[in-house]
Curated annotation (Swiss-Prot):
Protein family: Belongs to the class-III pyridoxal-phosphate-dependent aminotransferase family. HemL subfamily.
Record InterPro entries: 4pyrrol_synth_GluAld_NH2Trfase, Aminotrans_3, Aminotrans_3_PPA_site, PyrdxlP-dep_Trfase, PyrdxlP-dep_Trfase_major, PyrdxlP-dep_Trfase_small
Requisite cofactors: pyridoxal 5'-phosphate
GO biological process terms held by the UniProt record: protoporphyrinogen IX biosynthetic process
The protein's annotated pathway: Porphyrin-containing compound metabolism; protoporphyrin-IX biosynthesis; 5-aminolevulinate from L-glutamyl-tRNA(Glu): step 2/2
UniProt-listed CDD domains: OAT_like (cd00610)
Subcellular localization, as worded in the UniProt entry: Cytoplasm
Modified positions (N6-(pyridoxal phosphate)lysine) in chain numbering: K273
GO MF entry, a single one: pyridoxal phosphate binding
Name of protein: Glutamate-1-semialdehyde 2,1-aminomutase
Quaternary assembly: Homodimer.
Gene3D superfamilies: Aspartate Aminotransferase, domain 1, Type I PLP-dependent aspartate aminotransferase-like (Major domain)
Length: 440
């Protein structure tokens, strides 16, 4: 039986119309506008566990999870309790606090490559400052990034990017000057020969290579193990730094991040999302020798009014402590994600729908293409019109997915069998509806 909900969006529609008068596009991050899936966005009022609720009272199983931070689900009781306690003592001081030390010790203890860490306010700040540090440390100017990898919206990294830049067809943003762009070299993801040729030609000028070890902003696209180790070797050979952007994967795919899966130690690592427990945060860290080039002990400048603020540090420390003290969480996340992937695969096989799947731990993406997705080119073969219809079919059945083909499904500790089973059921109903549509 079709369990499609009767959704009402009157209040969300009014709020969106009003927002468009005072906020560009009505949203504070482009993907939230839902333009790529052909509808206006519901305005979310609250979340609890695996669910979110919009302003019209509609209830959804949430697989966005605030774009990754909420690995424990919405409003985890311990996180909420600790945040309430901090609110009674002060929200920000612009001065050192003990909680900054505690989370720094926890992160450096979990990630062997990170001997020192600096807190900032966003993933964009983390990657931007990590590159400044790499340039200051090496005395070189050029950086290498990979097509389809998204590292935030700083000028030098908005070149052939993923995430919203890919969704909205703006791989090279206006406003990025030629002088900035000339120091950014782009390369094909998972292409060993390509990166070797770049270093052969310009290796002595390259300060760093920055990469998402598991690209989560063109779906879910992991590095091959061979490519990962080739990157580590060639950067070492040429004296360039290897920077892992683990804003999405850090503490998500394992407690040691993606680098623990590949058994590689990058020189610098960028973090965000989970380490803030749902509050704004970013961080970058690495070898002591490199990190001590940062001010106030070194010449490379970085600062932030709200960096390390007690609220974000408390939410992050609480979240990381729960993950650290409950090692079985990652095994359970793997089982849940595996069950979901298996259910999806069975559906597309039965309905004869072209789809391929990539999954690492609790990050999952179903691409509507026959191709095995390994880079931007293969990701771009996905049928975005089918995804758009799939998204709307799922939303109408109470399942909230990313409003773009080129993002990730995040499974949280709060998702249980009830939610997983309902999601699989909704996917079958929705995809069957799409399959029976003669226009597809």
């Amino acid at each position: 039986m079709d369990k499609r909900s009767i959704m009402k969006y009157e209040r969300s529609q009014k709020l969106f119309e009003a927002s468009q008068e005072v906020i560009p596009g009505g949203v504070n991050s482009p993907v939230r506008a839902f333009s790529s899936v052909g509808m206006n966005p519901p305005f979310i009022k609250r979340g609890k566990g695996a669910y979110i609720y919009d302003e019209d009272g509609n209830k959804y199983i949430d697989y966005v999870g605030s774009w990754g931070p909420l690995i424990l689900g919405h409003c985890h009781p311990e996180v909420v309790e600790n945040l309430k306690a901090v609110l009674e003592t002060g929200t920000s001081f612009g001065a050192p606090t003990e909680i900054e030390l505690k989370i720094a010790e926890l992160i450096t203890g979990a990630i062997p490559s990170v001997e020192m860490i600096r807190m900032v306010n966003s993933g964009t700040e983390a990657t931007m400052t990590a590159l400044r540090l790499a340039r200051g440390y090496t005395g070189r100017n050029k950086i290498v990034k990979f097509n389809g990898n998204y590292h935030g919206h700083s000028d030098g990294l908005l070149i052939k990017a993923g995430s919203g830049a890919l969704t909205h067809g703006v791989p090279n943003s206006p406003g990025v000057t030629p002088d900035v762009a000339k120091n950014t070299i782009t390369a094909k993801y998972n292409d060993i020969e390509g990166i070797m040729e770049i270093f052969k030609q310009q290796g002595e000028e390259i300060a760093a290579v920055i990469i998402e070890p598991i690209a989560g902003n063109m779906g879910v696209v992991p590095m091959t193990n061979k490519f990962a180790h080739a990157l580590r070797k060639i950067t070492e050979d040429y004296g360039a730094l290897l920077i892992f952007d683990e804003v999405m994967t850090g503490f998500r795919v394992s407690f040691g991040g993606a680098q623990s899966l590949y058994q590689i130690k990058p020189d610098l690592t960028c973090f965000g999302k989970i380490i803030g427990g749902g509050l704004p945060v970013g961080a970058f860290g690495g070898k002591r020798e490199i990190m001590e080039h940062l001010s106030p002990v070194g010449p490379v400048y970085q600062a932030g009014t709200l960096s390390g603020n007690p609220l974000a540090m408390t939410a992050g420390y609480t979240t990381l402590s729960i993950l650290h003290n409950n090692s079985g969480i990652y095994e359970e996340l793997e089982k849940k994600a595996q069950k979901l992937e298996k259910g999806f695969k069975k559906i597309v096989k039965e309905l004869q729908i072209d789809a391929s799947f990539n999954r690492v731990g609790s990050m999952l993406c179903m691409f509507f293409t026959k191709e095995k997705v390994s880079d931007l080119e293969t990701a771009s073969t996905s049928n975005t019109e089918i995804y758009s219809q799939y998204f709307r079919a799922m939303l109408s059945r109470g399942v909230y997915l990313a409003p773009t083909q080129f993002e990730t499904m995040f499974i949280s500790d709060a998702h249980g069998d009830v939610e997983i089973n309902r999601t699989i059921e909704a996917a079958y109903e929705g995809l069957k509806e799409i399959r029976n549509n003669p226009s597809i």
